[in-house]
């Protein structure tokens, strides 16, 4: 399998999950401005949406959208317990979290990354997004991870989204439970490896 990624983007989430599964895979960097792959290919020919992440399977099939990719990967290695088994209620709570993170947190960043957003509107956007992290912080005051006490695909996604906060001047430092959680997740060997590989931290 091959993961097409851009360093520090939402593709970090499936990158982490891939490493957590122990599956064999390769990665190829994408320049989202030129829409070219690291090897010079036209990225739009691979994913006409022009977005990462993209997972290319060994048979050539293409899977896009991070929430779909992480569930697919987790199901390939059920022994890693990255997502609950089909039909288990726990699984749907995990999917509930993935959907919340995608619709409320991930999308909540969009105006902060856009040059079209009026300066006067930025505080409103930040306050709304901060409120989502306040809720998450409260959840983490009662348990080690977002879906309980063990790492799941939802944690890979939350960790990824939380990394963007400093880049948009969103202050989360007062959320102590969230900060403790992020420090713990960052210490996971597979998370550390993904961060180093993408050049986000030094070895």
From Swiss-Prot:
Binding residue positions for glutathione: 10, 35, 52, 65-66, 99, 103-107
Entry keyword Membrane: no
Keyword match Lipid metabolism: no
Protein keywords: Cytoplasm, Transferase
Domain GST N-terminal: 1-81
A single MF term (Gene Ontology): glutathione transferase activity
Compartment(s): Cytoplasm
Gene3D superfamilies, per database record: 1.20.1050.10, Glutaredoxin
Enzyme Commission no: 2.5.1.18
Main location: cytoplasm
CDD domains listed in its UniProt record: GST_C_Beta, GST_N_Beta
Domain called GST C-terminal: residue spans: 87-203
UniProt enzyme class: transferase
Catalytic reaction(s) noted: RX + glutathione = an S-substituted glutathione + a halide anion + H(+)
InterPro entries documented for this protein: Glutathione-S-Trfase_C-like, Glutathione-S-Trfase_C_sf, Glutathione_S-Trfase_N, GST_C, Thioredoxin-like_sf
GO CC aspect terms: cytoplasm
Role according to the record: Conjugation of reduced glutathione to a wide number of exogenous and endogenous hydrophobic electrophiles.
Annotated family: Belongs to the GST superfamily. Beta family.
Record-linked NCBIfam families: PRK10542.1
Summary of subunit composition and partner proteins: Homodimer.
Protein name: Glutathione S-transferase GST-6.0
Gene name as annotated: gstB
